[in-house]
Amino acid sequence: MSNIDPKARTWAEIDMAALKHNFEIAKRTGKKVLCVIKANAYGHGAVHCGLFLEKQGADFFAVACLSEAIELREGGITKPILILGYTPEKYAEMLAKYDITQAVQDERTALEFGRYAAEAGVNLNVHVKIDTGMSRTGIFAQGEEAALAAADTIERIYNIPGITVKGMFTHFSVADTPSEDEYTAWQFKNYTTVLNALTAKGLRPEVCHASNSAAILAHPEAHLDMVREGIILYG
């Protein structure tokens, strides 16, 4: 017989009062609040935290991948869920089945999602990501000319059967660095150039968002319709 205690030797105790306090920082902006609970809510327990935050008034959740989104739905989360990362386009029907919103990074991906969704007889909600200066993923929109071209691309995405554009977002790369505020302002200008061009076409997305945790605290001008509260939820 082994004398080893099978119970875990370590555990984490989550202070839900602290989580509520941190959530309310974003809520005080007066905007919709998207809570980022990817990677098991940064190790804090995605379903447990998600259910709690939903009761506190969270409007939206974001995760990294399809399996994380399904875990939330099956755990009882009812608010909209946005997948920030890549999902193979063939899973369009599953995304629609679980009422999950998918981020799309380019026109080709949007076309493929639309094709699979139309073949399955479903409609998929998407948020279009634009690259205003992070230089990672999204439709290129750095500078006025590129931003106007991005608006034309998004106009074409609006017309793809099988998908509905519900939102548009970007990610600030250095919003947490005061010495780089000029760059964050440039990114936001690129975003608003795209947004204004779409609005002129009669295509303003329902939910526009750009502010990550740092921008919630430091850049109120960029709060738009919704803010994305990530790491500041947890510490």
Please describe what each predicted stretch is.
Residues 217-235:
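Active-site loop ensemble at the mouth of alpha/beta enzyme cores that anchors a bound cofactor
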Residues 3-6, 10-13, 18-21, 31-209, ...:
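Active-site-proximal beta-alpha core segment in soluble small-molecule metabolic enzymes
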Residues 24:
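Histidine/acidic residue-rich metal-binding segments in metalloenzymes
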